[in-house]
């Protein structure tokens, strides 16, 4: 199977899960697609302290990222098995407040593992940015914002032992 582009992946996503979740509501993707030209999606860009508009491709990415957050293991295995990794690089989802960098399939596995751990232990709103480092560095960095910026480093051993 050839690598999917953003739109192909979006269409595939509709076939396996007709809805996607954000923090507040469940949205029917087919209905969303029908009224697509009328949609304006703005979000508050914390980095630049201004409202920003998502272009069409970014909206696709947003939906995909949201879907991946809700999807099951079989679907994740499908994504990795069919080499759809390129599509998943540098996805930004304003509702989930995360930046995801996935250089390869192995890091992708760790990403899902981390998300599962974080979901069990931390509210997503507490993590504005998740950056997955190169595996050679043997660590995963989660940058959290509270009273002050905090950068916490975890090793793969930490993950396996359930530290996060």
Place the predicted regions along the sequence by residue.
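Surface-exposed, low-hydrophobicity interaction/linker segments
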Residues: 28-81
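Short, flexible coil/linker elements and helix-boundary hinge sites characteristic
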Residues: 48-49, 83, 123, 162
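The feature captures the alpha-helical scaffold/lid subdomain characteristic of nucleotidyltransferase
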Residues: 14, 18-21, 90-93
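Histidine-centered divalent-metal-coordination microenvironment in nucleic-acid enzymes
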Residues: 65-103
């Amino acid at each position: 199977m050839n690598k999917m582009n953003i739109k192909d992946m979006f269409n595939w996503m509709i076939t396996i899960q007709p809805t996607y979740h954000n923090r507040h509501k469940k949205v029917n993707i087919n209905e969303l697609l029908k009224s697509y030209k009328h949609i304006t999606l703005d979000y508050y860009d914390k980095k630049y302290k201004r409202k920003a508009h998502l272009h069409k491709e970014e909206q696709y990415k947003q939906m995909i990222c949201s879907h991946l957050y809700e999807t099951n293991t079989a679907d994740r295995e499908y994504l990795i098995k069919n080499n759809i990794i390129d599509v998943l690089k540098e996805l930004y989802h304003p509702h989930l407040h995360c930046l995801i960098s996935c250089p390869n399939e192995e890091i992708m596995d760790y990403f899902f593992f981390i998300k599962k751990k974080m979901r069990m232990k931390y509210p997503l709103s507490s993590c504005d940015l998740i950056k997955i480092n190169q595996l050679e560095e043997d660590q995963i960095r989660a940058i959290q914002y509270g009273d002050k910026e905090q950068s916490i480093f975890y090793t793969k051993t930490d993950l396996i032992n359930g530290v996060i």
